[in-house]
Protein backbone atom coordinates (compact mmCIF):
# COMPACT_ATOMS: atom_id res chain seq x y z
CA UNK A 1 0.00 0.00 0.00
CA UNK A 2 1.20 3.50 -0.80
CA UNK A 3 0.09 6.65 0.98
CA UNK A 4 0.68 10.14 -0.39
CA UNK A 5 1.29 12.35 2.65
CA UNK A 6 0.67 16.09 2.15
CA UNK A 7 1.39 18.03 5.36
CA UNK A 8 0.34 21.32 3.73
CA UNK A 9 0.37 24.57 5.70
CA UNK A 10 0.33 25.76 9.31
CA UNK A 11 -0.32 23.05 11.87
CA UNK A 12 -0.69 20.50 9.09
CA UNK A 13 3.00 19.67 9.39
CA UNK A 14 2.76 18.88 13.12
CA UNK A 15 -0.44 16.87 13.07
CA UNK A 16 0.53 14.89 9.97
CA UNK A 17 3.67 13.76 11.78
CA UNK A 18 1.54 12.33 14.59
CA UNK A 19 -0.76 10.48 12.17
CA UNK A 20 2.27 8.94 10.46
CA UNK A 21 3.60 7.99 13.89
CA UNK A 22 0.39 6.06 14.60
CA UNK A 23 0.46 4.37 11.19
CA UNK A 24 4.09 3.41 11.78
CA UNK A 25 3.03 1.74 15.02
CA UNK A 26 0.47 -0.32 13.12
CA UNK A 27 3.13 -1.24 10.57
CA UNK A 28 5.38 -2.40 13.37
CA UNK A 29 2.69 -4.32 15.27
CA UNK A 30 0.96 -5.99 12.33
CA UNK A 31 3.69 -6.09 9.70
CA UNK A 32 1.76 -3.85 7.30
CA UNK A 33 3.51 -3.03 4.03
CA UNK A 34 2.95 0.71 3.70
CA UNK A 35 5.11 3.21 1.82
CA UNK A 36 4.95 7.00 2.07
CA UNK A 37 5.46 9.61 -0.63
CA UNK A 38 5.41 13.27 0.43
CA UNK A 39 3.81 15.97 -1.71
CA UNK A 40 3.22 19.73 -1.69
CA UNK A 41 -0.13 21.52 -1.77
CA UNK A 42 -1.48 24.96 -0.99
CA UNK A 43 0.70 27.75 0.37
CA UNK A 44 3.72 25.52 0.90
CA UNK A 45 3.49 24.44 -2.73
CA UNK A 46 3.15 28.03 -3.94
CA UNK A 47 6.19 29.12 -1.93
CA UNK A 48 8.35 26.37 -3.44
CA UNK A 49 6.96 26.05 -6.97
CA UNK A 50 4.86 29.14 -7.67
CA UNK A 51 1.74 26.98 -7.98
CA UNK A 52 -0.73 25.82 -5.31
CA UNK A 53 -1.05 22.41 -6.99
CA UNK A 54 2.16 21.12 -8.61
CA UNK A 55 1.97 18.46 -11.32
CA UNK A 56 4.27 16.28 -9.21
CA UNK A 57 1.69 16.22 -6.42
CA UNK A 58 -0.95 15.02 -8.86
CA UNK A 59 1.39 12.25 -10.00
CA UNK A 60 2.01 11.13 -6.42
CA UNK A 61 -1.72 11.20 -5.66
CA UNK A 62 -2.43 9.16 -8.79
CA UNK A 63 0.03 6.46 -7.76
CA UNK A 64 -1.12 6.26 -4.13
CA UNK A 65 -3.89 4.15 -2.65
CA UNK A 66 -4.91 7.08 -0.45
CA UNK A 67 -3.90 10.65 0.37
CA UNK A 68 -3.36 11.95 3.89
CA UNK A 69 -3.65 15.76 4.06
CA UNK A 70 -2.84 18.04 7.00
CA UNK A 71 -4.29 21.50 6.29
CA UNK A 72 -4.19 24.15 3.58
CA UNK A 73 -4.21 27.95 3.57
CA UNK A 74 -3.46 30.95 5.73
CA UNK A 75 -3.51 34.77 5.67
CA UNK A 76 0.03 34.83 4.27
CA UNK A 77 -1.40 33.99 0.84
CA UNK A 78 -4.72 35.86 0.98
CA UNK A 79 -3.59 38.64 -1.37
CA UNK A 80 -2.44 36.34 -4.14
CA UNK A 81 -4.47 36.19 -7.37
CA UNK A 82 -7.43 33.84 -6.97
CA UNK A 83 -5.89 31.14 -9.16
CA UNK A 84 -2.73 31.05 -7.00
CA UNK A 85 -4.34 30.85 -3.57
CA UNK A 86 -3.90 27.68 -1.50
CA UNK A 87 -7.61 26.87 -1.57
CA UNK A 88 -7.51 26.61 -5.37
CA UNK A 89 -4.96 23.84 -4.97
CA UNK A 90 -7.28 21.97 -2.63
CA UNK A 91 -10.27 22.36 -4.94
CA UNK A 92 -8.08 21.34 -7.87
CA UNK A 93 -6.87 18.06 -6.39
CA UNK A 94 -10.41 17.18 -5.35
CA UNK A 95 -11.62 17.77 -8.89
CA UNK A 96 -8.67 15.95 -10.47
CA UNK A 97 -9.22 12.83 -8.37
CA UNK A 98 -12.99 12.98 -8.79
CA UNK A 99 -13.55 13.20 -5.04
CA UNK A 100 -17.27 13.76 -5.21
CA UNK A 101 -18.22 12.78 -1.65
CA UNK A 102 -17.10 14.22 1.67
CA UNK A 103 -17.84 12.21 4.81
CA UNK A 104 -17.69 13.95 8.17
CA UNK A 105 -18.55 11.88 11.23
CA UNK A 106 -19.73 14.06 14.12
CA UNK A 107 -19.24 12.15 17.35
CA UNK A 108 -19.32 13.39 20.93
CA UNK A 109 -17.14 11.30 23.21
CA UNK A 110 -18.65 10.92 26.69
CA UNK A 111 -15.50 12.42 28.22
CA UNK A 112 -15.92 15.58 26.12
CA UNK A 113 -19.66 16.23 26.49
CA UNK A 114 -18.90 19.09 28.89
CA UNK A 115 -16.54 20.69 26.34
CA UNK A 116 -19.42 21.54 24.01
CA UNK A 117 -20.96 25.00 24.19
CA UNK A 118 -24.34 23.25 24.38
CA UNK A 119 -25.69 21.50 27.46
CA UNK A 120 -24.25 17.99 27.92
CA UNK A 121 -27.68 16.38 27.73
CA UNK A 122 -28.20 17.93 24.27
CA UNK A 123 -25.01 16.51 22.74
CA UNK A 124 -24.09 13.49 24.87
CA UNK A 125 -24.18 10.36 22.72
CA UNK A 126 -24.35 12.30 19.45
CA UNK A 127 -23.13 10.18 16.51
CA UNK A 128 -24.04 11.41 13.03
CA UNK A 129 -22.53 11.43 9.56
CA UNK A 130 -22.60 14.40 7.20
CA UNK A 131 -22.42 13.38 3.53
CA UNK A 132 -21.53 16.41 1.42
CA UNK A 133 -21.29 16.60 -2.37
CA UNK A 134 -17.89 17.97 -3.20
CA UNK A 135 -17.34 18.72 -6.90
CA UNK A 136 -20.45 20.61 -8.01
CA UNK A 137 -22.57 23.52 -6.78
CA UNK A 138 -21.68 27.19 -6.65
CA UNK A 139 -17.99 26.54 -5.94
CA UNK A 140 -17.48 25.14 -9.44
CA UNK A 141 -20.38 26.52 -11.48
CA UNK A 142 -19.66 28.72 -14.50
CA UNK A 143 -19.83 31.56 -15.30
CA UNK A 144 -18.31 33.26 -12.29
CA UNK A 145 -16.39 36.47 -11.74
CA UNK A 146 -16.52 40.19 -11.07
CA UNK A 147 -17.60 42.59 -13.82
CA UNK A 148 -18.24 46.30 -14.10
CA UNK A 149 -21.82 47.41 -14.61
CA UNK A 150 -22.30 51.12 -14.99
CA UNK A 151 -20.43 52.79 -12.15
CA UNK A 152 -20.01 49.77 -9.86
CA UNK A 153 -18.65 46.25 -9.73
CA UNK A 154 -20.92 43.20 -9.68
CA UNK A 155 -19.83 39.81 -8.39
CA UNK A 156 -21.57 36.68 -9.67
CA UNK A 157 -21.43 32.91 -9.28
CA UNK A 158 -23.47 30.05 -10.69
CA UNK A 159 -25.15 27.34 -8.61
CA UNK A 160 -25.47 24.27 -10.79
CA UNK A 161 -26.05 20.54 -10.31
CA UNK A 162 -26.65 17.77 -12.82
CA UNK A 163 -28.96 14.84 -12.14
CA UNK A 164 -26.03 12.44 -12.25
CA UNK A 165 -24.03 14.44 -9.67
CA UNK A 166 -26.97 14.49 -7.28
CA UNK A 167 -27.77 10.81 -7.79
CA UNK A 168 -24.18 9.78 -7.13
CA UNK A 169 -23.93 11.49 -3.74
CA UNK A 170 -27.46 10.45 -2.77
CA UNK A 171 -26.66 6.80 -3.42
CA UNK A 172 -23.64 7.02 -1.14
CA UNK A 173 -25.72 8.58 1.63
CA UNK A 174 -28.32 5.84 1.39
CA UNK A 175 -25.66 3.10 1.41
CA UNK A 176 -24.08 4.58 4.52
CA UNK A 177 -27.48 4.91 6.18
CA UNK A 178 -28.07 1.20 5.62
CA UNK A 179 -25.04 0.50 7.81
CA UNK A 180 -26.28 2.87 10.51
CA UNK A 181 -29.83 3.61 11.68
CA UNK A 182 -31.46 3.64 8.24
CA UNK A 183 -32.32 7.36 8.21
CA UNK A 184 -31.33 10.07 5.71
CA UNK A 185 -32.13 13.77 6.08
CA UNK A 186 -31.57 15.64 2.81
CA UNK A 187 -30.93 19.37 3.16
CA UNK A 188 -31.80 21.85 0.40
CA UNK A 189 -33.32 25.27 -0.30
CA UNK A 190 -35.94 24.19 -2.82
CA UNK A 191 -38.40 26.93 -1.86
CA UNK A 192 -36.31 29.59 -3.64
CA UNK A 193 -33.67 27.81 -5.77
CA UNK A 194 -34.44 25.83 -8.94
CA UNK A 195 -31.16 23.98 -8.54
CA UNK A 196 -32.37 22.72 -5.17
CA UNK A 197 -35.76 21.77 -6.61
CA UNK A 198 -33.89 19.39 -8.89
CA UNK A 199 -31.84 18.22 -5.90
CA UNK A 200 -34.96 17.26 -3.94
CA UNK A 201 -36.55 15.55 -6.94
CA UNK A 202 -33.49 13.42 -7.73
CA UNK A 203 -32.82 12.50 -4.08
CA UNK A 204 -36.44 11.41 -3.72
CA UNK A 205 -36.18 9.19 -6.81
CA UNK A 206 -32.93 7.63 -5.58
CA UNK A 207 -34.58 7.01 -2.23
CA UNK A 208 -37.24 4.88 -3.91
CA UNK A 209 -34.50 2.31 -4.62
CA UNK A 210 -33.76 2.07 -0.90
CA UNK A 211 -37.11 1.13 0.68
CA UNK A 212 -35.36 0.07 3.89
CA UNK A 213 -34.05 3.63 4.44
CA UNK A 214 -36.28 6.46 5.68
CA UNK A 215 -35.84 9.72 3.76
CA UNK A 216 -36.85 13.16 5.01
CA UNK A 217 -36.16 16.63 3.62
CA UNK A 218 -35.34 19.85 5.46
CA UNK A 219 -34.63 23.40 4.31
CA UNK A 220 -31.09 24.51 5.10
CA UNK A 221 -32.07 27.40 7.38
CA UNK A 222 -34.17 25.06 9.51
CA UNK A 223 -31.38 22.47 9.47
CA UNK A 224 -28.92 25.04 10.82
CA UNK A 225 -31.30 25.77 13.68
CA UNK A 226 -32.10 22.12 14.40
CA UNK A 227 -28.40 21.23 14.60
CA UNK A 228 -28.09 23.29 17.77
CA UNK A 229 -31.61 22.70 19.05
CA UNK A 230 -31.80 18.91 18.76
CA UNK A 231 -28.76 17.45 16.94
CA UNK A 232 -29.48 13.86 17.95
CA UNK A 233 -32.51 13.77 15.64
CA UNK A 234 -30.05 13.40 12.73
CA UNK A 235 -28.13 10.33 11.63
CA UNK A 236 -27.05 10.72 7.99
CA UNK A 237 -27.28 14.33 6.79
CA UNK A 238 -27.08 14.68 2.99
CA UNK A 239 -26.14 18.10 1.59
CA UNK A 240 -24.82 19.92 -1.42
CA UNK A 241 -21.37 21.47 -1.51
CA UNK A 242 -21.96 24.97 -0.14
CA UNK A 243 -24.58 24.08 2.45
CA UNK A 244 -22.45 21.15 3.58
CA UNK A 245 -19.42 23.39 3.95
CA UNK A 246 -21.34 25.58 6.39
CA UNK A 247 -23.34 22.95 8.26
CA UNK A 248 -20.36 20.65 8.81
CA UNK A 249 -18.40 23.40 10.56
CA UNK A 250 -21.46 24.25 12.66
CA UNK A 251 -21.85 20.59 13.59
CA UNK A 252 -18.15 20.36 14.38
CA UNK A 253 -18.55 22.69 17.33
CA UNK A 254 -21.15 20.41 18.87
CA UNK A 255 -18.23 18.20 19.83
CA UNK A 256 -16.43 20.91 21.77
CA UNK A 257 -13.55 21.32 19.34
CA UNK A 258 -13.17 21.13 15.58
CA UNK A 259 -9.75 19.62 16.31
CA UNK A 260 -11.44 16.32 17.16
CA UNK A 261 -13.10 15.76 13.80
CA UNK A 262 -11.84 13.70 10.86
CA UNK A 263 -13.11 13.66 7.30
CA UNK A 264 -12.86 11.58 4.15
CA UNK A 265 -13.27 12.71 0.55
CA UNK A 266 -13.95 9.76 -1.75
CA UNK A 267 -14.41 9.06 -5.44
CA UNK A 268 -16.59 6.34 -6.93
CA UNK A 269 -13.72 3.84 -6.63
CA UNK A 270 -13.31 4.61 -2.89
CA UNK A 271 -9.94 6.24 -3.43
CA UNK A 272 -9.83 8.99 -0.88
CA UNK A 273 -8.15 12.03 0.57
CA UNK A 274 -8.27 12.12 4.37
CA UNK A 275 -7.94 15.31 6.39
CA UNK A 276 -9.14 16.82 9.66
CA UNK A 277 -12.05 19.24 9.46
CA UNK A 278 -10.11 22.21 10.85
CA UNK A 279 -7.98 24.71 9.00
CA UNK A 280 -4.26 25.43 9.11
CA UNK A 281 -4.46 27.57 12.30
CA UNK A 282 -1.35 29.65 11.55
CA UNK A 283 -1.75 31.48 14.87
CA UNK A 284 -0.69 28.34 16.77
CA UNK A 285 1.52 26.67 14.16
CA UNK A 286 4.86 25.51 15.52
CA UNK A 287 3.84 25.90 19.16
CA UNK A 288 3.10 22.23 19.80
CA UNK A 289 -0.42 22.91 21.08
CA UNK A 290 -2.53 21.73 18.12
CA UNK A 291 -4.87 18.80 18.61
CA UNK A 292 -3.74 15.89 16.38
CA UNK A 293 -6.74 13.65 17.10
CA UNK A 294 -8.77 14.82 14.09
CA UNK A 295 -5.79 13.96 11.89
CA UNK A 296 -5.24 10.60 13.60
CA UNK A 297 -8.92 9.73 13.28
CA UNK A 298 -8.73 10.71 9.60
CA UNK A 299 -6.05 8.04 9.25
CA UNK A 300 -8.51 5.60 10.83
CA UNK A 301 -11.07 6.53 8.16
CA UNK A 302 -8.40 5.93 5.53
CA UNK A 303 -7.94 2.35 6.73
CA UNK A 304 -11.71 1.85 6.78
CA UNK A 305 -12.69 3.28 3.40
CA UNK A 306 -9.65 3.11 1.08
CA UNK A 307 -7.21 0.53 2.44
CA UNK A 308 -9.72 -2.20 3.25
CA UNK A 309 -8.60 -2.63 6.86
CA UNK A 310 -11.51 -1.74 9.13
CA UNK A 311 -9.76 -3.66 11.91
CA UNK A 312 -6.94 -1.10 11.85
CA UNK A 313 -9.51 1.71 11.92
CA UNK A 314 -11.16 0.13 14.96
CA UNK A 315 -7.79 -0.15 16.70
CA UNK A 316 -6.97 3.54 16.18
CA UNK A 317 -10.40 4.65 17.35
CA UNK A 318 -10.14 2.46 20.46
CA UNK A 319 -6.72 3.92 21.24
CA UNK A 320 -8.08 7.47 20.98
CA UNK A 321 -10.98 6.55 23.26
CA UNK A 322 -8.53 5.09 25.80
CA UNK A 323 -6.40 8.24 25.83
CA UNK A 324 -9.44 10.47 26.37
CA UNK A 325 -10.76 8.20 29.12
CA UNK A 326 -7.39 8.53 30.87
CA UNK A 327 -7.77 12.31 30.95
CA UNK A 328 -5.17 13.58 28.46
CA UNK A 329 -6.21 16.76 26.65
CA UNK A 330 -4.67 19.24 24.26
CA UNK A 331 -5.34 22.90 24.93
CA UNK A 332 -8.51 23.14 22.83
CA UNK A 333 -10.36 20.50 24.88
CA UNK A 334 -8.67 21.06 28.24
CA UNK A 335 -10.79 21.65 31.36
CA UNK A 336 -9.99 21.82 35.05
CA UNK A 337 -8.91 18.41 36.32
CA UNK A 338 -7.63 17.20 32.94
CA UNK A 339 -3.98 16.54 32.09
CA UNK A 340 -2.69 19.08 29.57
CA UNK A 341 -0.48 17.58 26.85
CA UNK A 342 1.26 18.84 23.73
CA UNK A 343 0.68 17.78 20.12
CA UNK A 344 3.51 15.26 20.16
CA UNK A 345 2.62 14.00 23.63
CA UNK A 346 -0.94 13.29 22.49
CA UNK A 347 0.36 11.41 19.47
CA UNK A 348 2.69 9.44 21.71
CA UNK A 349 -0.14 8.52 24.06
CA UNK A 350 -2.26 7.24 21.17
CA UNK A 351 0.69 5.22 19.90
CA UNK A 352 1.29 3.73 23.35
CA UNK A 353 -2.41 2.86 23.75
CA UNK A 354 -2.39 1.26 20.32
CA UNK A 355 0.56 -0.93 21.24
CA UNK A 356 -1.12 -1.99 24.48
CA UNK A 357 -4.43 -3.02 22.91
CA UNK A 358 -3.04 -4.63 19.74
UniProtKB/Swiss-Prot annotation:
<dbReference type="GO" id="GO:0051287">
    <property type="term" value="F:NAD binding"/>
</dbReference>
<keyword id="KW-0100">Branched-chain amino acid biosynthesis</keyword>
<comment type="similarity">
    <text>Belongs to the isocitrate and isopropylmalate dehydrogenases family. LeuB type 1 subfamily.</text>
</comment>
<feature type="binding site">
    <location>
        <position position="221"/>
    </location>
    <ligand>
        <name>substrate</name>
    </ligand>
</feature>
<feature type="binding site">
    <location>
        <begin position="279"/>
        <end position="291"/>
    </location>
    <ligand>
        <name>NAD(+)</name>
    </ligand>
</feature>
<dbReference type="GO" id="GO:0003862">
    <property type="term" value="F:3-isopropylmalate dehydrogenase activity"/>
</dbReference>
<keyword id="KW-0432">Leucine biosynthesis</keyword>
<feature type="site" description="Important for catalysis">
    <location>
        <position position="139"/>
    </location>
</feature>
<feature type="binding site">
    <location>
        <position position="245"/>
    </location>
    <ligand>
        <name>Mg(2+)</name>
    </ligand>
</feature>
<dbReference type="GO" id="GO:0009098">
    <property type="term" value="P:L-leucine biosynthetic process"/>
</dbReference>
<keyword id="KW-0963">Cytoplasm</keyword>
<feature type="binding site">
    <location>
        <begin position="74"/>
        <end position="87"/>
    </location>
    <ligand>
        <name>NAD(+)</name>
    </ligand>
</feature>
<feature type="binding site">
    <location>
        <position position="132"/>
    </location>
    <ligand>
        <name>substrate</name>
    </ligand>
</feature>
<keyword id="KW-0520">NAD</keyword>
<feature type="binding site">
    <location>
        <position position="104"/>
    </location>
    <ligand>
        <name>substrate</name>
    </ligand>
</feature>
<keyword id="KW-0028">Amino-acid biosynthesis</keyword>
<dbReference type="InterPro" id="IPR004429">
    <property type="entry name" value="Isopropylmalate_DH"/>
</dbReference>
<feature type="binding site">
    <location>
        <position position="221"/>
    </location>
    <ligand>
        <name>Mg(2+)</name>
    </ligand>
</feature>
<dbReference type="Pfam" id="PF00180">
    <property type="entry name" value="Iso_dh"/>
</dbReference>
<dbReference type="InterPro" id="IPR024084">
    <property type="entry name" value="IsoPropMal-DH-like_dom"/>
</dbReference>
<dbReference type="InterPro" id="IPR019818">
    <property type="entry name" value="IsoCit/isopropylmalate_DH_CS"/>
</dbReference>
<keyword id="KW-0560">Oxidoreductase</keyword>
<feature type="site" description="Important for catalysis">
    <location>
        <position position="189"/>
    </location>
</feature>
<feature type="binding site">
    <location>
        <position position="249"/>
    </location>
    <ligand>
        <name>Mg(2+)</name>
    </ligand>
</feature>
<keyword id="KW-0479">Metal-binding</keyword>
<comment type="function">
    <text>Catalyzes the oxidation of 3-carboxy-2-hydroxy-4-methylpentanoate (3-isopropylmalate) to 3-carboxy-4-methyl-2-oxopentanoate. The product decarboxylates to 4-methyl-2 oxopentanoate.</text>
</comment>
<protein>
    <recommendedName>
        <fullName>3-isopropylmalate dehydrogenase 2</fullName>
        <ecNumber>1.1.1.85</ecNumber>
    </recommendedName>
</protein>
<keyword id="KW-0460">Magnesium</keyword>
<comment type="pathway">
    <text>Amino-acid biosynthesis; L-leucine biosynthesis; L-leucine from 3-methyl-2-oxobutanoate: step 3/4.</text>
</comment>
<comment type="subunit">
    <text>Homodimer.</text>
</comment>
<keyword id="KW-0464">Manganese</keyword>
<dbReference type="GO" id="GO:0005829">
    <property type="term" value="C:cytosol"/>
</dbReference>
<dbReference type="GO" id="GO:0000287">
    <property type="term" value="F:magnesium ion binding"/>
</dbReference>
<feature type="binding site">
    <location>
        <position position="94"/>
    </location>
    <ligand>
        <name>substrate</name>
    </ligand>
</feature>
